[in-house]
């Protein structure tokens, strides 16, 4: 009877939302795993590397490798232990919020706190911890050697903050990052091991309250040709760090304040404001493609002009027909360029209808979170033809919806990999999910 109901549900869903896709779920063996943002990449060895996060005071997030050829998952390590903080009773290294960046046979990434204090509906760096525990020691920069399968701790982020955003100049071996909650912009030279702190990027960042709050940029766009690094603030300013400079500069001739993106209060903690949500470098065109999270608009950023060109809206077809934005308050991070260097992949939302009415969700939230239930859609965009395609909603074989999806990697098998919530036997965990794209 249950199987009949599942088949009926999928039939109705496909009729309402389009053809749709069925996702395969994995079990990495981490039942307490919580939501991951970014935290997944495909490496040159053809394997998928990912982090499953944790919000516990007692253990950290965990690193895994999915081996495509063997179709098996290998556990690589606990973030807290990798950072040398096992049994120290400090707030654990619960998360990694960044992609893996490959350089000379190593994957570079960083850590973030997962245990917070909730204040006025917002996640705050924990200053109040249980008796016997200590405060968060700070995020670490880490390297994983693909040949020896060993980790290296490169040290702490500036001001003992967590690392929220990180990218890499792979031509010169320089990491760029933004910390949390204040938001210090920093660089780390892999060869010389020199860390430089260039100061806060947006006032008090996410440590502020009320009018002093500023949501931080989640994507640092690095131009490998010049070595320049770009990021935004919620006011819509674009900042540039030029290789060798002593400070960051604001671009005078371009910004993200576009009418198509909407109107935002930069002190609003429930949106990304005018920040870009995710960016990716296109090696052939030597430009960035990016998505503005709250509007879902695709744009092209040529740093040499500089110029932002708004292209098309990448939200799902049901969202466009409804005229509504995604229900994830920051918009989605799952945006990347495929191996063919012409196809953009985007995991976005789509409205859910009940009795013919759209489930609206909450009007306002105070942090990055889902305001209500929505479907997951896979959208592809052919850069050469400006060809948009919504592949329809994604469901698990049992009819459930993947939720809290803010990561993406396209494997050497041309399948899409992400991290999403999975419910099994009444328990919810975040785990690896595979989506086969219908061509």
Predicted feature locations:
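Beta-strand-rich domains and repeat architectures in extracellular enzymes and scaffolds
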Residues: 27-61
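Repeated scaffold domains used in trafficking and secretory/extracellular systems
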Residues: 34-39, 84-99, 161-167, 206-221, ...
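Blade-level signature of beta-propeller repeat domains, shared across WD40, Kelch, NHL, RCC1
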Residues: 402-439
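Loop/turn-rich, solvent-exposed surfaces of beta-rich toroidal or solenoidal domains
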Residues: 290-291, 324-383
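Beta-propeller blade signature
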Residues: 63-69, 127-147, 187, 298-302, ...
């Amino acid at each position: 009877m249950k199987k009949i109901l599942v088949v009926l549900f999928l039939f109705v869903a496909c009729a309402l939302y389009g053809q749709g896709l069925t996702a395969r779920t994995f079990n990495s063996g981490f039942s307490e795993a919580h939501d991951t943002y970014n935290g997944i990449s495909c490496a040159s060895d053809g394997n998928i590397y990912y982090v499953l996060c944790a919000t516990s005071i007692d253990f950290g997030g965990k690193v895994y490798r999915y081996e495509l050829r063997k179709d098996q998952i290998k556990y690589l390590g606990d973030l807290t232990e990798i950072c040398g903080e096992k049994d120290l009773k400090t707030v654990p290294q619960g998360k990694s919020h960044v992609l893996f960046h490959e350089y000379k046979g190593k994957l570079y990434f960083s850590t973030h706190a997962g245990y917070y204090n909730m204040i006025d509906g917002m996640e705050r760096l924990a200053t109040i911890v249980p008796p016997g525990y200590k405060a968060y020691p700070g995020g670490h920069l880490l390297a994983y050697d693909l040949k020896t399968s060993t980790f290296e701790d490169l040290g702490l982020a500036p001001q003992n903050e967590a690392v929220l955003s990180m990218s890499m100049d792979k031509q010169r071996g320089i990491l760029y990052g933004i910390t949390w909650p204040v938001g210090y912009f920093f660089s780390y030279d892999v060869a010389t091991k020199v860390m430089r702190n260039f100061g806060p990027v947006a006032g008090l960042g996410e440590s502020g309250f009320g009018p002093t709050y500023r949501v931080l940029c989640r994507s640092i766009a690095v131009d490998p040709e010049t070595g320049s690094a770009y990021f935004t603030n919620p006011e819509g300013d674009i900042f540039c760090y030029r290789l060798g400079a002593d400070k960051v500069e604001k671009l005078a001739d371009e910004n993200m304040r576009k009418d198509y993106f909407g109107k935002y209060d930069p002190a609003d903690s429930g949106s990304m404001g005018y920040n870009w949500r995710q960016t990716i470098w296109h090696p052939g065109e030597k430009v960035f493609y990016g998505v503005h999270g709250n509007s879902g608009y695709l744009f092209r950023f040529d740093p040499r002009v500089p110029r932002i060109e708004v292209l098309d809206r990448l939200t799902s077809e049901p969202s466009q027909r409804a005229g509504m934005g995604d229900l994830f308050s920051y918009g989605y991070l799952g945006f990347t360029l495929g191996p063919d260097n012409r196809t953009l992949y985007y995991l976005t939302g789509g409205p859910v209808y009940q009795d013919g009415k759209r489930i609206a969700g909450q009007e306002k939230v105070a942090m990055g979170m889902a305001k209500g239930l929505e479907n997951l859609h896979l959208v592809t965009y052919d850069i050469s033809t400006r060809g948009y395609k919504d592949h329809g909603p994604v469901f698990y074989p049992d009819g459930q919806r993947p939720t809290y999806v803010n990561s993406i990697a396209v494997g050497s098998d041309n399948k899409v990999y992400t991290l999403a919530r999975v419910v099994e036997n009444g328990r919810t965990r975040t785990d690896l999910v595979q989506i086969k794209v219908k061509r």
